[in-house]
A protein has these predicted regions:
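Predominantly extracellular/luminal cell-surface or secreted proteins
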Residues: 154-158
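Sec-dependent signal peptide recognition
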Residues: 7-15
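N-terminal secretory signal peptides that target proteins for export/translocation
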Residues: 1-7
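C-terminal motif of bacterial Sec signal peptides marking the signal peptidase cleavage site
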Residues: 21-24
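Acidic, glycine-anchored loop motifs typical of Ca2+
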Residues: 159-168
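A domain-level signal for the mature, folded cores of soluble proteins
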Residues: 34-149, 173-334
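Bacterial signal peptide processing site
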Residues: 26-29
Length: 334
């Protein structure tokens, strides 16, 4: 079974009103995490036991790739707010601007960093993706041998038909699901630095604390804390995998980030990558599960969320951060 975090459950209950994966926040602290509820969908008036279906068929105008970024909310990290490689500039100071930044980069096939643990991106498609029982969609990362920075995948069906990802998120099962070292509802609070060019401090729901290191020699922007987050602290909630990264050299010069077996983005898996040279990871809607680990039957999905699953850092390489380059419907045809 998973290790489920109850330590700060009362705190989360008081400060969050989770709305379909995006959390409401109080005036002092922002909270972002998966929906705690798992409703089956709105009722059909003619048959209350049958959920309404808002399935969106493909049309002649449809495309295989994602068509919308609904929310880009990274954790702090070395590429956040950074111009040279991160592609940010001084205009990215609102959530809308951040979403547009992410979409423009992904449309060009350029990676977007999710930062440290809990950072995420939500994308949608112009059609519903069918559950075929096999691999249904893929997310592109930038992993390579000994450099895997796994991101967990969540899926959502547009249950209320409003075209927005405000219904129920379901986590997709991966190779680490059910292990004692995997922690559900793991929460990290990030703190805005009081001075420029400083590390970002964090505390977690396990009573631990640490920092996102400031790597001035490589990324010297003033802040690694997202400029569009208005509050001085914010919380990211998700499922945490046990870190596997280690310093092979023993001198801090050569860090290895081993592969996880399967089920994660930006992971150099020999199982779910379609070819040896591919950086795409394939996913099955049939691997969806509820918060208790029970299988969930979804005929289709409309939205995908990718979230950094590791809270760790690798010396001069910095924080372990999932990168996303795109997402597409594997079985697309019209």
């Amino acid at each position: 079974m998973w290790k489920f975090n109850y330590k700060n459950l009362a705190k989360w209950a008081m400060i969050t009103l989770l709305m379909g994966g995006f959390a409401a926040c109080n005036s002092d602290e922002d909270v972002f995490g998966p929906d705690a509820d798992t409703p089956s969908g709105p009722s059909n008036p003619s048959d209350p036991s049958t959920p309404v279906s808002y399935y969106r068929p493909k049309t002649s105008e449809s495309k295989a790739t994602f068509d919308q970024v609904y929310q880009y909310m990274p954790a702090p990290g070395q590429f956040i707010n950074e111009l040279k490689t991160g592609g940010f500039d001084s205009t990215h100071t609102t959530q809308e601007a951040a979403n547009l930044y992410a979409k423009e980069r992904l449309d060009k096939g350029i990676w977007v960093s999710l930062g440290g643990f809990g950072g995420y991106i939500v994308v949608g498609f112009d059609h519903s993706i069918d559950n075929t029982g096999g691999y249904d969609f893929a997310v592109i990362g930038n992993s390579f041998n000994n450099s895997s920075e796994p991101g967990i995948v969540w899926v959502m069906q547009d249950e209320n038909g409003d075209g927005l990802p405000n219904d129920t998120w379901y986590e997709l099962r991966g190779s680490e699901t059910g292990k004692e070292t995997t922690i559900q509802n793991y929460a990290v609070t990030y703190y805005r630095p009081e001075t420029v060019q400083s590390p970002v401090k964090w505390t977690d729901s396990e009573g631990q604390s640490g920092e996102i290191d400031y790597l001035k020699a490589y990324h010297n922007q003033d802040y690694y804390y997202p400029l569009w987050v208005e509050s001085d602290t914010y919380i990211l909630v998700g499922t945490r995998l046990e870190p596997k990264n280690y310093d092979q050299s023993g001198k801090g010069t050569y860090w290895v980030l081993p592969t996880f077996d399967w089920g994660y983005v930006d992971n150099f898996s020999s199982i779910d990558r379609p070819t040896e040279k591919s950086v795409d990871n394939r996913f099955r809607i049939s691997d969806a599960m509820d918060q208790n680990g029970n299988a969930v039957s979804l005929a289709y999905i409309d939205f995908v969320k990718v979230q950094t699953a590791i809270n760790s850092k690798s010396g001069w390489l910095g924080e372990v951060s999932t990168e996303v380059v795109g997402a597409y419907d594997i079985n697309f045809s019209y």
